[in-house]
Amino acid sequence: MAQKENTYPWPYGRQTAQSGLNILPQRVLRKEAVTPSALVLMSRSNTQPTAAPGQKVVENSSGTPNFSTRSFTIDDFEIGRPLGKGKFGNVYLAREKKSHFIVALKVLFKSQIEKEGVEHQLRREIEIQAHLQHPNILRLYNYFYDRRRIYLILEYAPRGELYKELQKCRTFDEQRTATIMEELADALIYCHGKKVIHRDIKPENLLLGLQGELKIADFGWSVHAPSLRRKTMCGTLDYLPPEMIEGRTHNEKVDLWCIGVLCYELLVGNPPFESASHNETYRRIGKVDLKFPPSVPAGAQDLISKLLKHNPSDRLPLAQVSAHPWVRAHSRRVLPPSAPQSVP
């Protein structure tokens, strides 16, 4: 018989609700690319949620069952194939039994989380991601736990990691890169408006939805900072901005640097400051030693150069990223912006 979930207090620090999100890294896992069977499963399930006999399915305006007000146990899910494996646990394709809604169930082992001392990162990921709702941000619907494991109920991104797609293609064309830049800019405008800094934008932390739309994931390094000023080192070396490697106070403008690095990597196939040693990478970042191969279009060079500025206050604002002539000329965004944008 399955262990009974949700009878034990949150094991890390102050107590948190045992299940439900209406009370309020380490890279953990990777997701595989979509398979035909998964697409069929989604088309049969997520487009037409059905209820168990005598059970009404409550949906929100987006057609997603309202998971945030329910308590869950592992017995509420049919578990499918693994989507990814990591040092803290695994991610599985899963279907909630009452609604037949397809999700990605991230199963984390408490022992591993405690061993690595990343309890605070997990808590931060849950508290931040659960309260973000944007078409280009991966949803965290709810969580629950038992004696040994913590379960995160996540939106399923059928086309998997942007990182794996980039590995397969080597580089992206202007249309795809510009579309990603517009999606990222819109999602980060939303995050920054809620005083959330992601701090770890990179291909491994970006997923692709059913129509290829971008989904920002992995908020383990992100922070909800009302002051929007931090001084801790985090993120991935190739994507770290000068103010972080120099130990200076940083704010939400670190994300502007990150999307500049990402834009370069998508078009070129490697990050702009990648070097044979960490010390050389640090040196190149500090000097903003930016060199473009001839293959990078002039418009993209202009955008990247305006984002990769040593002084954070000189970096191009997100609204101007969306409105940049190169982005406007090439972006073919699938989903509409979350709100009208204006260029300051």
Swiss-Prot record:
A GO molecular function for this record? protein serine kinase activity
**Which residues are named in the active-site annotation?**
D200 (proton acceptor)
Q: Which segments constitute the Protein kinase domain? A: 77-327
Subcellular location per the Swiss-Prot or TrEMBL entry: Nucleus; Chromosome; Chromosome, Centromere; Chromosome, Centromere, Kinetochore
SMART domains assigned to the protein according to its UniProt record, in alphabetical order: S_TKc
Which Gene Ontology BP annotations are present?
cellular response to UV; cleavage furrow formation; midbody abscission; mitotic cytokinesis checkpoint signaling; mitotic sister chromatid biorientation; mitotic spindle midzone assembly; mitotic spindle organization; negative regulation of B cell apoptotic process
Q: Which reaction does it catalyse?
A: L-seryl-[protein] + ATP = O-phospho-L-seryl-[protein] + ADP + H(+); L-threonyl-[protein] + ATP = O-phospho-L-threonyl-[protein] + ADP + H(+)
Where along the chain is ATP bound? L83, G84, K85, G86, K87, F88, G89, N90, V91, K106
- The enzyme class is transferase
The subunit field of the Swiss-Prot or TrEMBL record says: Component of the chromosomal passenger complex (CPC) composed of at least BIRC5/survivin, CDCA8/borealin, INCENP, AURKB or AURKC; predominantly independent AURKB- and AURKC-containing complexes exist. Associates with RACGAP1 during M phase. Interacts with SPDYC; this interaction may be required for proper localization of active, Thr-232-phosphorylated AURKB form during prometaphase and metaphase. Interacts with p53/TP53. Interacts (via the middle kinase domain) with NOC2L (via the N- and C-terminus domains). Interacts with CDCA1. Interacts with EVI5. Interacts with JTB. Interacts with NDC80.
Family, similarity comment: Belongs to the protein kinase superfamily. Ser/Thr protein kinase family. Aurora subfamily.
Role this protein plays: Serine/threonine-protein kinase component of the chromosomal passenger complex (CPC), a complex that acts as a key regulator of mitosis. The CPC complex has essential functions at the centromere in ensuring correct chromosome alignment and segregation and is required for chromatin-induced microtubule stabilization and spindle assembly. Involved in the bipolar attachment of spindle microtubules to kinetochores and is a key regulator for the onset of cytokinesis during mitosis. Required for central/midzone spindle assembly and cleavage furrow formation.
Question: What protein am I looking at?
Answer: Aurora kinase B
Organism lineage: Eukaryota, Metazoa, Chordata, Craniata, Vertebrata
